[in-house]
């Protein structure tokens, strides 16, 4: 058609497809074509006859293929508004009485509206990025002012110099980075015997016959982490590598994915022999429904179950490795490395529980994906989040940034353009903080993880590179060889081709919309010289029936088939349905023999592992200019970069390489010459060298705690840090405190504790029954002294009461006492359960208020094995000598305080949070001095309706480099800030790691509402009983702002590990719920 007539052709096709799947407005106006209101652009109005007012928004890639949607996309992407306007004028001018013309006119309005909506979204994206950059600059100025107060003039100038280095050439940047490396990893480290943990949660992970391309979760990341585990296990100094993933016991997938462990390699052979646990292993941890294979977007509510299961395995393995290589001392992970957002979230929690360094690799980032989908204009933000759980994914990435020591990226572009979008990372602020740390100047709790570029590795041992061939022998192998001697996949590919001896253009990826295969087919179909000179080979995963594939993949494949038909590419395009992983090298080899080219036209490619594979087989490359391929092309110098949206540029680049034999040979030789830069040994050496720079934080108490009660006397001289501090206190202040021991009783709750402790110390087995002391205290008195270590070490069950019952003023209500008493009655009603069980109280209140509450209910503190106070900022053991000072007063577990002190600055948090909380709220926020402690900053909240949500506060805190845990508590009357590693849920994991009481043997008693950390306590392997009716309201309304992730992304909607009470608050009802959840959990 001449001029703009072809637009009418599209519109006619739209009308003809009125009955297509998902058809929209009346009159066949077409399904996916509708884009909201039918209002025209510019000065136009809405045609009253238009059905567009009720039309649905364009369908996203997750929906079934719709030809209407396809045609509309063609118009919206490729037509200028003026063209649409001229077409509309023509339709109006030739109007007749037929309904078809009226519908055609209406469709013009609707498509015009879509085009303008797309531009509006682009403008909103630009404004959003601009506003964010402005806010970042303001934060940098504020942070620089805060930090500059501690620097001398010369140091200030040095810091400015650090910022100025942002504009230095790339070469200088790399030189400076490598100069900071420690000595490169070598054979001299073989005595280290390291244990490394990798986590890749989603997809189907196994060592052999990987089903890459089966779904969008089983792609290049799966192959990468498996090969990384194998390669690391072969490095000197690495004893064991565990790759954690989810266990899948579903009939939908192969039985091998349900095996708890799978050996990848037995490890390096250094002549000294290896222990039975050496090597690399896949460890599969169950979480969520055991009989279902879940896509990654559905895994978020079950992450804490995975954490608890992984933690149990790590502790068991640490003991086993200790027996094998460390004379019985625990061998904790050298590093915990999370891959992707979900595994990053898990790694952050595991790292915090074990106090070991964490490393993160993002692979594909949520903020970047959100921006890309928003630019397409097909889905609203709400639809994007519903489909991809994108906001929960972004929060997972932010949490991982909070905890990570090191972030490994594949490319420099990933650092500058992708991680730079996150609240938790700022390139300039990271340099300032690193400069201060080098000079020994306090950063006031501010921290930014270090970003390093380490390109992924590849195993080249099985790569067979074809020898250089002369110009005229492209098809000689096929003429000489019989069909039986050729690899089967060659025959499968060549059966599609009329002339299989032409050069091949190979694309290998999943049929995912972001891989941009359809644009490649268009480029090939519309370039006649390219069609005449080459064949196109599309390896798009494995399929049996397109209708049985996921909707997004099916849509891409259907579009590809329609394009092949449109351009009549039969005989020039091969698209086999099946291939094995072992066939991939043969496909590369075939392409190389035919003097072909490999192309990766993805919209954004985080790295581009297939580009490395292709280069190793001697193939020149054409690749997207967005993402990792830029660095790969610069390193290998073996191809061309293109704009993935420009199909003409794609066709020109392919034609240039295929037609110019000299250029083809040069690119081939360059790729083969430089490919060792991407070998696995080189990758692992750089990786281990970088990891060695992380600060090792293994807690010393793990080495000092005896394994059982009988070992206490043997290790009496190996007192922990707490024992040393006890001795020093007693030596210095015993005389002062001794004079007041016989004074009149005091109303101070601490004095009550002191009196109880004195009775225990003076008691003997003979007079225990006559002493009015708690039952647990009487048990401890049988030895004539307090326990050196908490009774938690010998408990088989722990009942944790974490009911947040507070009045309007934030003080504890009598309902909380009632819950405690009824739980005690319920557990003690079963004599067998009572003998093996202990109790813990977990609250946001400080210790003095907690003790006053217990005193009010006449509950001795020693009835509890542990008190978790201040929102998890302190842990006490009332019946343990280590937690009682010389004056008989309770004091917190000092090892726990050392544990959570990581990246914490009380003064830095106090100043920053006070400034943020007061911003725009006048005097609504005031310090709560009585609730503060060295690891908790507390503020009064006068009006909860005038404060920012936790989401908004976290965003601002992260932008300033502070890493901490914020929560509103006590009926939203307090804002409390505790260290990153502290929280009520993490305190339970600390008790597991410290004293060996498994989280799976804990019972959590909570109300229906609570503090803003309430929902994060509900998930995990512990059993939870929710008591109805005891908490009328909590602080949950301040957790999230609009547009954030939802509660169901954190807490599973249904879980056998959660039970509810019914009716009144009675011990019998609590016991019924406890038995119900125990029975349900045993059937998992």
UniProtKB/Swiss-Prot annotation:
Regulation: Activity is regulated by phosphorylation and moderated by concentration of metabolites and light.
Protein's GO biological process: sucrose biosynthetic process
Class of enzymatic activity (EC top level): transferase
InterPro entries (UniProt xref): Glyco_trans_1 (IPR001296), SPP-like_dom (IPR006380), SPS (IPR044161), SPS_C (IPR035659), SPS_pln (IPR012819), Sucrose_synth_GT-B1 (IPR000368)
Compositional bias segments (type: Low complexity): 48-61
Pfam families: Glycos_transf_1, GT-B_Sucrose_synth, S6PP
Keywords per UniProt: Glycosyltransferase, Transferase
EC number: 2.4.1.14
Stretches assigned to coiled coil: none
Record function comment: Plays a role in photosynthetic sucrose synthesis by catalyzing the rate-limiting step of sucrose biosynthesis from UDP-glucose and fructose- 6-phosphate. Involved in the regulation of carbon partitioning in the leaves of plants. May regulate the synthesis of sucrose and therefore play a major role as a limiting factor in the export of photoassimilates out of the leaf. Plays a role for sucrose availability that is essential for plant growth and fiber elongation.
Record text on subunit structure and interactions: Homodimer or homotetramer.
The protein, known as: Probable sucrose-phosphate synthase 1
Source species: Oryza sativa subsp. japonica
Organismal lineage: Eukaryota, Viridiplantae, Streptophyta, Embryophyta, Tracheophyta
Gene encoding the protein: SPS1
């Amino acid at each position: 058609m001449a001029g703009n007539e072809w637009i009418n052709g599209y519109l006619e096709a739209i009308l003809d497809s009125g009955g297509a799947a998902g058809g929209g407005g009346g009159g066949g106006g077409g399904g996916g074509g509708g884009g909201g209101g039918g209002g025209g652009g510019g000065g136009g109005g809405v045609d009253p006859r238009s059905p567009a007012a009720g039309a649905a928004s364009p369908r996203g890639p997750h929906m079934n293929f719709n030809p209407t949607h396809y045609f509309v996309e063609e118009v919206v992407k490729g037509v200028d508004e003026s063209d649409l306007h001229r077409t509309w004028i023509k339709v109006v001018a030739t109007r007749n009485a037929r309904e078809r013309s009226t519908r055609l006119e209406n469709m013009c309005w609707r498509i015009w509206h879509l085009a303008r909506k797309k531009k509006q979204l682009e403008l909103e994206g630009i404004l959003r990025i601009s506003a964010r950059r402005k806010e970042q600059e303001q934060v940098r100025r504020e942070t620089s002012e805060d930090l500059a107060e501690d620097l001398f003039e010369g140091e200030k100038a040095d810091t400015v110099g650090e910022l100025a280095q942002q504009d230095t050439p790339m070469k200088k940047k790399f030189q400076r980075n490598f100069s900071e490396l420690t000595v490169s990893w070598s054979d001299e480290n073989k005595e280290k015997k390291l244990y490394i943990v990798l986590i890749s949660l989603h997809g189907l992970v196994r060592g052999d016959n990987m089903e890459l391309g089966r779904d969008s979760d089983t792609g290049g990341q799966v192959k990468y982490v498996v090969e990384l585990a194998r390669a690391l296990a072969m490095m000197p100094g690495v004893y064991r590598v565990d790759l954690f993933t989810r266990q899948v016991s579903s009939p939908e997938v192969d039985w091998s994915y349900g095996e708890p462990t799978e050996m990848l390699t037995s490890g390096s052979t250094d002549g000294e022999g290896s222990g039975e646990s050496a090597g690399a292993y896949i460890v599969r941890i169950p979480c969520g429904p055991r009989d279902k294979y879940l896509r990654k977007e559905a895994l978020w509510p079950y992450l804490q179950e995975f954490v608890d299961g992984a933690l149990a395995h790590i502790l068991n393995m640490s003991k086993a490795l200790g027996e094998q290589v460390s004379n019985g001392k625990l061998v904790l992970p050298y590093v915990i490395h999370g891959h992707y957002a979900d595994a990053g979230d898990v790694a952050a929690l595991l790292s915090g529980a074990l106090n070991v360094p964490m490393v993160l690799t993002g692979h594909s980032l949520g903020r970047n994906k959100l921006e890309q989908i928003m630019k397409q204009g097909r889905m609203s933000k709400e639809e994007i989040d519903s489909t991809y759980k994108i906001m929960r994914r972004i929060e997972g990435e932010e949490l991982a940034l909070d905890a990570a020591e090191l972030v490994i990226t594949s490319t420099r572009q990933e650092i500058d353009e992708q991680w730079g979008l996150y609240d938790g990372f700022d390139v300039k602020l990271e340099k300032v903080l690193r400069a201060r740390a080098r000079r020994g100047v306090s950063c006031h709790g501010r921290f930014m993880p270090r970003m390093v570029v380490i390109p992924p590795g590849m195993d080249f041992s099985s790569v067979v590179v074809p020898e250089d061939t002369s110009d005229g022998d492209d098809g000689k192998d096929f003429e000489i060889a019989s069909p039986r001697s050729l690899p089967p996949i060659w025959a499968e590919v060549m059966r599609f081709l009329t002339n299989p001896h032409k050069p091949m253009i190979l694309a290998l990826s999943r049929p995912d919309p972001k891989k941009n295969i359809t644009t490649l087919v268009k480029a090939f179909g519309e370039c006649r010289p390219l069609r005449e000179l080459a064949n196109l080979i599309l390896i798009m995963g494995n399929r049996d029936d397109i209708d049985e594939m996921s909707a997004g993949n099916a849509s891409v494949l259907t579009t590809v088939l329609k394009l092949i038909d449109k351009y009549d590419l039969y005989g020039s395009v091969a698209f086999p349905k099946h291939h094995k992983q072992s066939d991939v090298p043969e496909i590369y080899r075939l392409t190389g023999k035919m003097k072909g080219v490999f192309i990766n036209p993805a919209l954004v490619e985080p790295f581009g592992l297939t580009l490395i594979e292709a280069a190793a087989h001697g193939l020149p490359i054409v690749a997207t200019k967005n993402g990792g391929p830029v660095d790969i092309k610069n390193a290998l110098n073996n191809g061309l970069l293109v704009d993935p949206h420009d199909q003409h540029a794609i066709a020109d680049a392919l034609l240039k390489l295929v037609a110019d034999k000299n250029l083809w040979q040069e690119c081939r030789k360059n790729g083969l010459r430089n490919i060792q830069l991407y070998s696995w040994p080189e990758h692992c050496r750089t990786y281990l060298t970088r990891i060695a720079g992380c600060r090792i934080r293994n807690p010393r108490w793990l080495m000092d705690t005896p394994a059982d009660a009988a070992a206490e006397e043997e290790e009496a001289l190996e007192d922990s840090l707490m024992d040393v501090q006890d001795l020093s206190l007693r030596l210095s202040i015993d005389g002062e405190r001794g004079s007041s021991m016989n004074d009149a009783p005091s109303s101070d709750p601490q004095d009550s504790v002191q009196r109880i402790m004195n009775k225990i110390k003076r008691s003997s087995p003979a007079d225990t029954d006559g002493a009015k002391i708690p039952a647990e205290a009487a048990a401890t008195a049988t030895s004539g002294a307090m326990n050196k270590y908490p009774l938690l070490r010998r408990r088989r069950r722990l009942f944790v009461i974490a009911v947040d019952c507070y009045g309007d003023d934030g003080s504890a209500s009598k309902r909380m006492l009632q819950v405690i008493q009824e739980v005690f009655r319920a557990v003690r009603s079963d004599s067998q359960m009572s003998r093996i069980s202990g109790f813990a109280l977990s609250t946001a209140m400080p210790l003095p208020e907690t003790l006053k509450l217990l005193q009010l209910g006449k509950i001795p503190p020693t009835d509890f094995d542990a008190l978790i106070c201040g929102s998890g900022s302190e842990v006490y053991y009332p019946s343990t000598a280590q937690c009682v000072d010389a004056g008989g007063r309770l004091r917190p577990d000092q090892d726990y305080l050392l544990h959570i002190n990581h990246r914490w600055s009380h003064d830095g948090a106090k100043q920053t949070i006070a400034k943020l909380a007061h911003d725009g709220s006048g005097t609504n926020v005031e310090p709560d001095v009585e609730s503060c402690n060295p690891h908790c900053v507390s503020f009064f909240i006068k009006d909860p309706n005038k404060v920012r949500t936790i989401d908004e506060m976290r965003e601002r805190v992260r932008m300033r480099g502070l890493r901490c845990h914020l929560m509103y508590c006590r009926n939203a009357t307090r804002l409390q800030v505790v260290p990153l590693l502290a929280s009520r849920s993490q305190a339970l994991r600390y008790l597991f790691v410290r004293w060996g009481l498994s989280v799976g043997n804990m019972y959590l008693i909570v109300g229906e509402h609570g503090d803003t950390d309430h929902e994060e306590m509900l998930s995990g392997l512990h059993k939870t009983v929710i008591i109805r009716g005891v908490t009328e309201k909590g602080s949950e309304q301040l957790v999230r702002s609009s547009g954030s992730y939802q509660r169901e992304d954190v807490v599973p909607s249904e879980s056998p590990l959660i039970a509810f009470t019914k009716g009144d608050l009675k011990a019998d009802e609590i016991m019924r719920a406890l038995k119900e959840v125990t029975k349900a959990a045993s059937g998992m």
